[in-house]
């Protein structure tokens, strides 16, 4: 059987919030090393990859590998019934067609028990090659969310230009243009407020803002976000999940003609 217990249950609630608007259903691959998920969005433009390592859970047991087909909207609705302070346990038998979700308050005065029907999903796994990137930008996740939201008022695509001294986000539309430039910070006391840039060569790429705004739903999971870019390959937007794993979003750049 499979059983995973998470004292900080709010993490799982935040993970579902980060997934449910982008993908409707996905296969949760459960093994002794942890839980992983990989899925294209419904329009096959972006890809999301989630890893939750077994040692990030407070207790974890998986006797044999399971592939659980989950409707993310249904799972999100059930997780909304859990309080932010609740302890969450996921449980499934080896050949089960349901996933049990148990929510306990810290004093265990209230225990809620839900069973969610699983789906049969035919999922192809895409190999994601390891890449060296021309530019890797690490910045506060709230700042990135704000930039994407603000520039969405101007246009539907953003040009991200990365150079040694800073990274620039630009959008243009019918009402005009907007440019936001972040300089690399030199001496920030708090690491999660810093902007750091590792650059091998300058990059200038255009991305659809509506997808970036979907990705920023993961902001509550991490104080920082990492953007990895190279010409002609998908951007990677990565949010670390403290002591547990990460959620990575992949988005191919737009061709110049489309964006003009």
Curated annotation (Swiss-Prot):
The keyword DNA-binding applies. Disulfide bonds: none annotated. It comes from the Eukaryota. Residues 61-80 bind DNA. Keywords: DNA replication, DNA-binding, Isopeptide bond, Nucleus, Ubl conjugation. Monoubiquitinated by the ube2b-rad18 complex on Lys-164. Monoubiquitination at Lys-164 also takes place in undamaged proliferating cells, and is mediated by the dcx(dtl) complex, leading to enhance PCNA-dependent translesion DNA synthesis. It is found in: Nucleus. Pfam families: PCNA_C (PF02747), PCNA_N (PF00705). Signal peptide: none annotated. GO terms for biological process: leading strand elongation; mismatch repair; regulation of DNA replication; response to activity; response to bacterium; translesion synthesis. One of its GO terms (cellular component) is PCNA-p21 complex. PANTHER family: PROLIFERATING CELL NUCLEAR ANTIGEN (PTHR11352:SF0). Homotrimer. Forms a complex with activator 1 heteropentamer in the presence of ATP. Component of the replisome complex. This protein is an auxiliary protein of DNA polymerase delta and is involved in the control of eukaryotic DNA replication by increasing the polymerase's processibility during elongation of the leading strand. This is Proliferating cell nuclear antigen. It comes from Haplochromis burtoni.
